[in-house]
């Protein structure tokens, strides 16, 4: 993996990073901003170089939460750096109908595949009864506690878009960010993932036909319609994102205030 050609200030300077971004700097509660160097989102960590690991080890001790399925992890295990702790909690909905594991898509499955319907259903389901995001909530609260006040969190999936996109929305909302900030962060992936997406599609073009490749390209995109589907589903079920945070993840107003005291400046 080469250095990203579509540079953005939130991207970490990693040789083998995939869409590895710092959520720091985003506007959150009361006009405060998220501290840099504490909350990260990324794609797979399997291609990190020794230089990357040295760079990452200089920051706060990382709690890594890997949203990928077991077969994804087995195929491309994370490269861990010194001081990092690893948690693998799959975030895919408990259904064979929708699955963010893109490696399961083939010419045959893509032939009768409705990419848009697939993506919208994935985003309808991701926000609810999701053990991975419950784990994320717990890690956030642990990091904000006095005894763990030097820890950071890296949440990631395969490309850092869908499973990580909803997880990042959870973090941003818990810290008091508004919807426009959540949308902006999500849509940034369309740019920051571009080098890896182009590389992946070039490889897939060797084994997928044009129709299948077009479907795959759509699935690899970060469209506002996707994240808006998740946000609308949250609103329809709970009436507000605050109720969603409290009912699904135990993040009531008091818990959110504690997170904001630690993660914001």
Model-predicted regions and their roles:
Residues 1-154, 167-265:
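Cys-dependent protein tyrosine phosphatase-like superfamily
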Residues 159, 163-164:
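Ser/Thr-glycine-rich phosphate-binding loops at phosphate-binding pockets of nucleotides
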């Amino acid at each position: 993996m080469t250095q990203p050609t579509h540079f953005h200030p939130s991207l970490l300077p990693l040789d083998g990073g995939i869409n590895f971004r710092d959520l720091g700097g985003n506007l959150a509660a009361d006009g405060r901003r998220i501290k840099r160097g504490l909350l990260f989102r990324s794609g797979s960590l399997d291609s990190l170089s020794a230089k990357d690991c040295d760079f990452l080890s200089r920051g706060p001790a990382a709690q890594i939460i890997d949203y990928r399925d077991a077969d994804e992890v087995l195929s491309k295990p994370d490269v861990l750096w010194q001081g990092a702790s690893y948690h693998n909690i799959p975030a895919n909905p408990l259904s064979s109908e929708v699955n963010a594991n893109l490696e399961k898509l083939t010419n045959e499955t893509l032939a009768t595949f409705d990419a848009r319907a697939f993506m919208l259903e994935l985003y309808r389901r991701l926000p609810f009864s999701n053990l991975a995001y419950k784990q994320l909530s717990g890690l956030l609260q642990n990091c904000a506690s006095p005894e763990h006040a030097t820890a950071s969190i890296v949440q990631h999936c395969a490309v850092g878009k869908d499973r990580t996109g909803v997880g990042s929305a959870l973090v941003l909302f818990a810290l008091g960010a508004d919807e426009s900030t959540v949308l902006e962060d999500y849509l940034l992936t369309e740019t920051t993932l571009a080098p890896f997406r182009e590389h992946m599609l070039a490889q897939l073009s060797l084994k997928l036909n044009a129709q299948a490749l077009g479907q795959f390209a759509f699935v690899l995109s970060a469209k506002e319609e996707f994240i808006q589907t998740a946000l609308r589903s949250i609103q329809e079920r709970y009436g507000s994102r605050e109720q969603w945070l409290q009912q699904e993840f135990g993040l009531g107003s008091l818990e959110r205030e504690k997170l904001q005291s630690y993660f914001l400046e």
